[in-house]
């Protein structure tokens, strides 16, 4: 594993940041809430926290140096079949010939049809070394996304999906370039 990470880091400078598209998925739920807060000194912080039933969804997207691409919300958890359909129907049409798609080394990302759809769009597919979320800048975007979801505290599925659609615009190009840079990639083409 350490050797695979070393090889990946050696190859990183040769990757054109304008061509990189990092793809991943994360969960979102109707029970998301902040776990910490502030109140005036001596005053107890009181806020509503959801208990009981909630609904979990999956948010799938790609991250480029200039923004989020091909965002989709899936009802429930994602599996290999749904991920392959996402790549064919949403991601591949959003790619530009010559792009390099980078994904985690998960079984559902290696489902039949995923590589074919990406290569059919004139792009290349690379898998990150196992256990390397630090090399995937979309993880930083998802961290911000979840903080914004917790702050909003949406409690309905429809509201959660609408909120996710609006929050996609909260990732301007300069911020996306910082995510790439933080993960060790060149943030601008040389």
Model-derived regions: residue spans:
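Short functional hotspots at interaction and active-site rims
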Residues: 1-190
